[in-house]
Regions:
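Phosphate-interacting basic helix/loop segments used at nucleotide- and nucleic-acid interfaces
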Residues: 44-55, 158-171
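Short loop/turn motifs at secondary-structure junctions
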Residues: 57-59, 143
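Hydrophobic side chains in well-ordered alpha-helices
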Residues: 132-133, 205-209
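N-terminal phosphate-binding loop and adjacent alpha-helix
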Residues: 25-53, 207-210, 214-226
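Gly/Thr-rich phosphate-binding beta-strand-loop-beta motif of the actin/hexokinase/Hsp70
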Residues: 1-30, 61-66, 160-205
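Short, structured loop/turn "capping" segments at alpha-beta junctions
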Residues: 143-147, 193-195, 218-222
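Conserved NTP-handling cores and scaffolds of large molecular machines
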Residues: 54, 97-100, 158-161, 210-217
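Active-site neighborhood for divalent-cation/phosphate handling
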Residues: 65-163
Length: 226
């Protein structure tokens, strides 16, 4: 896709990136006040207004799932057919989905394979969330080109930063993701997503700590006079 939108519907902000002829042409966002989750029509209206304001007419969109809205893991499985993989993939996420595995959609990307084993990057996302995104896209008059986890989006950015050369040796990366309520570190092994680790506090709490907010300092067991 030479021209495409990338849209992330966050808890506090709607973010939109526009790629034109494989080059980032626009990036803009709109804050959602108080972190409230508005209804689908309001989200769609906000997206349409942002696109109109920037005079962006592209209708193809890839929606990016927030880290907490999907499960992504690298798995090694015995070599099997596509039908067998569809049957077995949900079991790889049983620790996360429990008895609700039927409520999720699953997908994968083949990293490597040999005569006995497959190396996969697998993902799971709630069906109802996919349906919500489809409804918002329809209301915003956009065509869904894909729904991808945030980690996969970061993987593509790293690949592009490396020059996108297939024969070039891939490096290990750690991406620091600064958020309001938490700090996340995403690890990539040889350019491929591996895992995410969460740390607290987030940026909003760090700001309070730096400002010597007594209540927050007490919460973290710190002395305001030090």
């Amino acid at each position: 896709m030479k021209n495409c939108l990338g849209i992330e519907l966050g808890n506090y902000r709607i973010k939109i990136a526009y790629m034109e002829k494989n080059v980032l042409a626009e990036y803009f966002s709109e804050r959602i006040e108080n972190g409230e989750k508005p209804d689908h029509r309001l989200i769609a209206q906000t997206v349409r207004e942002l696109l109109a304001e920037k005079n962006v007419r592209c209708k193809k969109a890839v929606f990016v799932l927030k880290q907490e809205d999907s499960y992504v893991k690298r798995v090694h499985m015995p070599l099997m057919t596509v039908d067998q993989l569809k049957l077995n993939l949900p079991y790889e996420f049983h620790d996360y989905t429990g008895d609700r595995s039927a409520d999720y959609r699953y997908d994968y990307a083949l990293i490597d394979r040999d005569e006995k084993e497959m190396d996969l990057l697998a993902a799971a996302c709630r069906k109802d969330l996919c349906e919500e995104i489809a409804e918002i896209a329809k209301l915003a008059k956009l065509k869904i080109a894909g729904i991808v986890p945030a980690a996969v989006g970061l993987e593509r950015i790293l690949e592009r930063a490396e020059g996108g050369e297939k024969d070039r040796e891939k490096k290990d990366f750690a991406v620091l993701d600064l958020r309001n309520r938490a700090v996340m570190i995403h690890f990539f092994r040889k350019g491929i997503y591996d895992m995410t680790r969460n740390m607290e506090p987030g940026c909003s709490e760090i700001e309070l700590l730096v400002g010597k907010n007594k209540e927050k300092l007490t919460e973290f067991g710190l002395d305001a006079d030090e």
